[in-house]
A protein has these predicted regions:
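N-terminal beta-strand motif that seeds the catalytic metal site of vicinal oxygen chelate
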Residues: 1-16, 74-79, 128
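Vicinal oxygen chelate
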Residues: 42, 79, 88-128
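Short, charged/polar surface micro-motifs in flexible loops or helix N-caps
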Residues: 46-50, 60-62, 84
Length: 128
């Protein structure tokens, strides 16, 4: 059984706010990991379905950068949204980076790509 995906963040509060605001994820728990001087937070959709997103913040991390897209080992997260244009409009108002405007993936599916505050690529999916 697939349990969770973990991504790093440079600012825990900002990331929790981002995923809560735009994807309605709710904070399940936060934990201090003393051995690695880190904090982790688990978020999940409001209905408690789907896999969990783990955010990891290392306090002693001096530098936080994303490599060029072609050099990344992790590709992207994906979230289904009810109305892709309305979602992107709200994201634009919050200065979210939109990397690919909406386009038809197939006759029933429209997708777009954005970045979270730390540059993690996120696919938005609208299914009709």
């Amino acid at each position: 059984m697939f349990v969770h995906t973990s991504i790093r963040t440079s600012n825990m509060e900002r990331s929790i706010d981002f995923y809560s605001k735009f994807f309605r994820l709710k904070l399940l728990s936060r934990h201090e990991i003393k051995q690695t001087n880190a904090e982790i937070a688990f978020l999940q959709d409001a209905e408690g379905k789907g896999c969990t997103l783990e955010l990891t913040f290392f306090r002693n991390q001096n530098k936080f950068t994303q490599p060029a897209y072609e050099e990344r080992l992790f590709d992207h997260l994906a979230f289904e949204v009810a109305d892709i244009n309305k979602t992107l409009e709200a994201m634009r108002e919050s200065n979210v980076v939109i990397t690919d405007e909406p386009f038809k993936f197939n006759e029933k599916t429209t997708i777009a790509f954005i970045e979270d505050p730390d540059g993690t690529l996120i696919e938005l999916i609208e299914r009709k």
